[in-house]
Amino acid sequence: MEPGRIVDTTAGPALCVKVCLVGAPQGGTMLNELYHSLDPVAFSAGPITIYWYGLAYMVGALLAGFVMYRTQKRWNIGFTPDDVMTVVIAVVFGLLIGGRLGYVLFYSNGYYFTHPLEIFFGTNGGGISGMSFHGGLAGGLLGGLFACRYLRLSPLTVADASFVGVPLALCLGRCANFVNGELWGKPTDLPWGVVFGGAAGNVPRHPSQLYEALLEGVVLFAILYVLSRRAKPLSQGSYLGIFVLGYGIVRFLIEFVRLPDAQLGYLAGGWLTMGQLLSLPLIALGAALLVYAWKTRRPQHRDWL
């Protein structure tokens, strides 16, 4: 979740999207505009409020862990359910800490350097807002590495099996971004433009969250899942490399139709965003991992290193 693109998500009717026809000038065409009016609250029970965003994190972690277990079982690696659960917990902790610190370092424009207590305690009791995928990825990888060291498991095989299911978690997270009405795109006259209202104004915009859910989530998962079902798995580092390279390319391209963070704007040339800048190292890292996998051709295995 990244402030600066958040619209009014505290008000509005129950979960729904209104579709209406807006009249065009005479001789023109009719344009379907989707009006965003989704409630970020999934349900409430007394003082407890559950948000779609939190549910996306929880269900996404469980899905990724399930796919990881099934994948390594198909590869005959020998991870136990306890191994997988330990890795998932470590990755989630690393992801949350890394995602928050990544936002603080790259997207807050120095705000938290003068308000350090708000990094993990929120602002005036208003809760914590602001997560960075790139920071979350780094934190998740470090958390997974520590878990592998503790369990004496091969980090690359764990990463390969894990990242087959990670796109499913990404898909849910981007859908939650859409429900929250945040991270919206630039104005568009395409038929599926969404009017988010609030800070986004009453103009149709690219639903860039859904573009990412489709490409980073569904498409990337389909590619990795099909490759994971080969009779002989790809060599160590291949699946991680495909994910990192694929995500970096998709994120770089989607940023062209996604508004930059309001507090940062464009970094250079009137088009380069922080998301694109941070995606360039991912593209290089993904390509390097694939070259490494191709040259070493190390088979997937269980034990540390």
Each PLM stretch: what is its role?
Residues 18-20, 25-305:
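A feature for loop-to-transmembrane-helix boundaries and adjacent hydrophobic helices
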